[in-house]
UniProtKB/Swiss-Prot annotation:
Sites where the protein binds L-aspartate: T126, N130, D131
GO terms, molecular function: argininosuccinate synthase activity; ATP binding
EC category: ligase
UniProt-listed InterPro entries: Arginosuc_syn_C, Arginosuc_syn_N, Arginosuc_synth, Arginosuc_synth_CS, Arginosuc_synth_type_1_subfam, AS_cat/multimer_dom_body, Rossmann-like_a/b/a_fold
Gene Ontology CC terms, in alphabetical order: cytoplasm
Name of this chain's protein: Argininosuccinate synthase
Record-annotated disulphide pairs: none
Gene name of this polypeptide: argG
């Protein structure tokens, strides 16, 4: 018998197939007495997705209520690439690998809820983190009347021991390595992998090397640098070393190139939207190359005013994504401006990968605003008259000279 009386008849659960969401699946059935539909997204997390189907069937979910989708291309094309056009970095460092995945998962849950006639959705995010906000803001933006169940905010399973006991009571399979407290929690997709908690909670301690899963230790990377060329069209990468690739395949290739060269590690203390600071370890191998390369092609194709405006707006755009406002009108407004700026962001960037670093070492574009005749120090340059700089400087100095005169008057009056 369910312990909660509810008008919820069917719920769509974001289901990974892991222990926590399997416990949530059974908890939803026993607590709400509702039918559970599972949705598992393949975002390139690097794990087998199909076992989630078998796990759900084992736990009593009807086969027709199990949804598994390969979203890798959609994820990179419609979420990752638009974000990278903006040069988005939360607090100047974090490339938003977890944040950008949540809107797509939420969108698919709402679509499945409509398809199956479900009246609620559920997620496995904890009550302390940002993901609960990201999921639920997206749910409500897409379906204002949807009911949301957040088990971690409701249940009394407050310890690992209690979770294991619940799993055993309901015959949920438990891997041996899941019986003790996990040393850290992990989130992963094609863009990144992140680890938080336990061994990482003391920000004074160095991250143990075993935590890293997607990059070799930069100290162990090859002693010879790797050079790659990335082609861009309208701000998006389209080819590596002359080979055209789909969005997901391109990011996969960049991930591998970055992995062997130890590129993309970040040890970060960030300000969560819910108000606390947290320490996390992020690996964004291919994304780190992409960020550097995109800024490289923009450096020769964007006008100064447009480039500086983008840089002013990037923190706001990044914050919106981090906080869960992907579907907000202000994010969409900023996206339209950003996409307009990318019309001529096309060309080729050469990047050097070496022992943890990714550095632009060359860039070219048919739309380049870089004019060698203007900047050369050699004789014969005809497009620029050095004498013109005098008037430019005098005009820009006018307010500074006026302020200086006032300061001199004040100083003289104080001495009198």
């Amino acid at each position: 018998m369910p312990s909660k009386q509810s008008d919820i008849k069917k719920v769509v659960l974001a289901y990974s197939g892991g222990l926590d969401t399997s416990i949530i699946l059974k908890w939803l059935e026993t607590t709400y007495g509702c039918e559970v539909v599972t949705f598992t997204a393949d975002l390139g997390q690097g794990e087998e997705i199909e076992p989630a189907r078998q796990k759900a069937i084992l736990l009593g979910v009807k086969p027709e209520n199990i949804f598994i989708e390969d979203l890798r291309e959609e994820f990179v094309r419609d979420y990752v690439f638009p974000m990278f056009r903006a040069n988005a970095q939360y607090e100047g460092l974090y490339l938003l690998g977890t944040s950008i995945a949540r809107p797509l998962i939420a969108k698919k849950q709402i679509e499945i809820a409509k398809k199956t006639g479900a009246d609620a959705v559920a997620h496995g995010a904890t009550g302390k983190g940002n993901d609960q906000v990201r999921f639920e803001l997206s749910y409500y933006a897409l379906d204002p009347d949807i009911k949301v169940i957040a088990p971690w905010r409701e249940w009394d399973l407050t310890s690992r021991t209690a979770l294991i006991a619940f799993a055993e009571q309901h015959q949920i399979p438990i891997a041996k390595d899941k019986r003790g407290d996990a040393p850290f929690s992990v989130d992963a997709n094609l863009l990144h992998a992140s680890s938080e908690g336990k061994v990482l909670e003391d920000p004074a301690e160095e991250v143990p090397d075993y935590v890293y899963s997607r990059t070799v230790n930069p100290e162990d990377a090859p002693d010879k640098p790797t050079y790659i060329e990335i082609d861009f069209e309208r701000g998006d990468p389209v080819a590596i070393d002359g080979e055209a690739l789909s969005p997901a395949n391109l990011l996969t290739r960049l991930n591998e190139l970055a992995r062997v060269n130890g590129v993309g590690r970040l040890d970060l203390v960030e300000n969560r939207f819910v108000g606390m600071k947290s320490r996390g370890m992020y690996e964004t191998p291919g994304g780190t190359i992409l960020y550097v390369a995109h800024r490289g092609i923009e450096s020769i194709t964007l006008d100064r005013g447009a480039a500086h405006l983008k840089d002013e707006l990037a923190p706001k755009y990044s914050e919106l994504i981090y906080n869960g406002f992907w579907f907000s009108p202000e994010r969409e407004m900023l996206q339209a401006l950003i996409d307009k700026s990318q019309e001529f962001v096309a060309g080729r960037v050469r990047v050097k990968l070496y022992k943890g670093s990714a550095v632009v070492v060359g860039r070219s574009s048919p739309y380049s605003l870089y004019d060698q005749d203007l900047v050369t120090f050699e004789e014969g340059a005809v497009a620029y008259d050095h004498r013109d700089a005098a008037g430019f400087i005098k005009l820009n100095a006018l307010r500074l000279r006026t302020l200086g005169k006032r300061a001199r008057k004040i100083a003289a009056a104080q001495k009198a």
